[in-house]
UniProtKB/Swiss-Prot annotation:
It comes from Agrobacterium fabrum (strain C58 / ATCC 33970) (Agrobacterium tumefaciens (strain C58)). Pathway: tRNA modification. The keyword Cytoplasm applies. The gene is ttcA. It catalyses: cytidine(32) in tRNA + S-sulfanyl-L-cysteinyl-[cysteine desulfurase] + AH2 + ATP = 2-thiocytidine(32) in tRNA + L-cysteinyl-[cysteine desulfurase] + A + AMP + diphosphate + H(+). PANTHER family: AMINOTRAN_5 DOMAIN-CONTAINING PROTEIN, SULFURTRANSFERASE-RELATED. It comes from the Bacteria. This is tRNA-cytidine(32) 2-sulfurtransferase. HAMAP family: TtcA. The thiolation reaction likely consists of two steps: a first activation step by ATP to form an adenylated intermediate of the target base of tRNA, and a second nucleophilic substitution step of the sulfur (S) atom supplied by the hydrosulfide attached to the Fe-S cluster.
Length: 311
């Protein structure tokens, strides 16, 4: 049976007895991870959950995320997306569809008013192996970034370096991050408009040292779906005071632009994401990707040229 069909089957089974009630404990047959005991019992939530699981599993298959990795560190910021990622991974693992060990990790970066108790209590409650580590990168960011500058880039780099270190210390071979479809598209357009290059946010990346995979299983998941999922699951969301306190960020401008396009032409975000998976180097302008100098008039028909080309 195809793995995506298995996902449909087990979500249907988990949701079959839920219709007609708003919330409540799941059946004793263990069809769902205990994290979902108090999840909504509606048809709409069941469809949302299934869609997200299929998107995650499709990313696993498309990008070879299950090739050789045995132990994953799941970055948990306290935001809706990282909570959702952890829940979906636990859902798959509970049903035997994810043959890896999971370790959740939160890096407390010393942000003002950060509620230190929320994540440890939540992770202990749901019985997930985890590590909470304090590193005051906030002070470094405040010191290094000039007044009026944006914190996100430096904050992200400092956080990533610490997560790499923690992953190694925990014996993990991959770091999983909760970036979704909109994050990837926003990054693409930031690079397009401000960086002068075509580059997005890879779903799977080998770090510079070559010892850790960085993976984004939510690459196909819509931010709107993740927000609905987080609200339905009632995750204890922790806001990011650093990002939320700054206006005029380039990413916010890209987010607004994409939202406007989607509002005027529904479905364009999915089309944009598909475009990132269908690249034609000969129709761009980068001679490093396509040898334009080798093009020559041969008189051969298209069929003959195809036959002469190496497979």
């Amino acid at each position: 049976m195809n793995i995506l069909t298995k996902i449909d089957d087990f979500v249907d089974q988990a949701g079959a007895d839920k219709v007609g009630a708003d919330h409540g404990p799941s059946e004793e047959n263990g069809s769902s991870h205990p994290l979902f005991d108090n999840a909504p019992r509606s048809v709409s939530f069941n469809k949302l959950r299934k869609r997200l699981l299929r998107n995650v599993r499709q990313a696993f298959e498309d990008f070879g995320m299950l090739n050789g990795q045995k132990r994953w560190l799941v970055g948990l910021s306290g935001g809706k997306d990282s909570y959702g990622l952890l829940a979906l991974l636990l859902d798959l693992k509970w049903r035997g569809l994810l043959p890896v060990e999971l370790v959740a990790c939160n890096l407390d970066q010393g942000q003002p008013n950060f509620p230190k108790h929320v994540l440890p209590e939540y992770l202990a409650k749901i019985g997930v192996a985890h590590r909470i580590e304090y590193r005051d990168t906030y002070s470094i960011v405040k010191e290094k970034v000039p007044s009026g500058g944006t914190y996100c880039s430096l904050c992200s780099r400092l956080r990533r370096g610490n997560l790499y270190r923690i992953a190694r210390e925990e014996g993990c071979d991959a770091l999983l991050l909760g970036h979704h479809r909109e994050d990837i598209l926003e990054t693409f357009f930031m690079n397009f408009f401000h960086g002068g290059r075509l580059a997005g946010m890879p779903a799977k990346l080998l770090n510079d040292e070559g010892d850790l995979m960085v993976m984004r299983p939510l690459a196909y998941c819509a931010e709107e779906d993740m927000a609905k999922f987080a609200a339905a699951m009632e995750f204890p969301i922790i806001p990011c005071d650093l990002c939320g306190s700054q206006d005029g960020l380039q990413r916010n401008a890209m987010k607004d632009m994409l939202a406007d396009i989607e509002r005027r032409m529904p479905g364009r975000k999915d089309v944009m994401l598909r475009a990132l998976a269908h690249v034609n180097p000969s129709h761009l302008l980068d001679p490093k990707l396509f040898d334009f100098s080798a093009l020559a008039v041969t008189g051969a028909s298209p069929e003959e040229r195809r036959e002469a080309s190496p497979p």
